[in-house]
Regions:
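A short, histidine- and acid-enriched strand-loop-helix "catalytic/donor-clamping" loop
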Residues: 164-170
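Glycine-rich phosphate/adenosyl-contacting loop at the front of the ribokinase-like
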Residues: 2-77
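Short beta-strand/loop segments at the ligand-binding rim of alpha/beta enzyme cores
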Residues: 157-164
Length: 229
């Protein structure tokens, strides 16, 4: 059995949603797949030989057990992944259009990940990283927990990577999304967002003008599809 220590200085903490994606397989069946941007990052770090740990909640249900087991089997530390008996695991129906573009329908709202509390947070150490996204800001209590985690790891001497990954349909009040996400961006050291997300958050179409509205991060990466980063 793998032995974990939360004091490892180069640990990557990943906070947010661990999702079961339902992907069409033919006309009558859906394939159950592990998903969620934060969960994917946690697995990616582990596969590259790094030490990653997941902070979040899934339901105490079959999908939650599937996600917890999948992350653990990939070498992710799941001691801070809580199986919540009161709420269901986030489940997303994924559809592809004729051009291969994906669309997402969130089947459980609010899902278990939205009920993470500050009590669920670990103690961060200097040199560690926290990666999170805006789904962990969509509603309370996870919003306060996420902002507290970002502040705590920076106070401890760690760093924050933030991927907005905007999903307005998850927010109880979508009008809160731009100001809350901008608050998180200001706390981050590294931010990765798409050009469309930058335009939405800044209200500006021009890339350079949009970037000029961002202050705080040391590095901002903007993805532009086929045009690159």
């Amino acid at each position: 059995m793998q032995q974990w220590s939360s004091k490892v200085t180069n640990r990557v903490w990943v906070m947010g949603d661990a999702v079961v994606d339902l992907i069409p397989e033919g006309e009558l069946h859906y394939l159950r797949c592990p998903g969620g941007a934060p969960a994917n990052v946690a697995v990616g770090v582990a596969r590259l030989g790094g030490e990653s740990a997941f902070i979040g909640r899934v339901g105490a249900d079959p999908f939650g057990r599937f996600m917890a087991g999948t992350l653990a089997s990939e070498g992710v530390d799941t001691r801070h992944l809580i199986q919540d008996p009161a709420h269901r695991t986030s489940t997303v129906l994924v559809e592809l259009d004729a051009e291969g573009e994906r669309s997402f329908t969130f089947m459980v709202r609010p899902s278990a990940d939205q009920f993470l509390t500050p009590v669920d947070l670990p103690v961060f150490q200097a040199g560690q990283w926290l990666l999170t996204c805006s789904i962990a800001l969509a509603n309370e209590p996870v919003r306060s927990s996420c902002l507290q985690a970002m502040a705590a790891i920076k106070a401890a001497g760690g760093r924050v990577c933030f991927d907005p990954n905007l999903r307005p349909e998850v927010w109880g009040n979508p009008a809160e999304m731009p100001p809350v996400v901008r608050e998180a961006i200001a706390q981050a050291d590294v931010v990765k967002l798409s050009l469309e997300e930058l335009q939405l958050l800044s209200g500006l179409d021009d890339l350079a003008a949009g970037l000029a509205t961002i202050s705080g991060p040391a590095l901002v990466l903007v993805t532009r599809g086929a045009a690159g980063v």
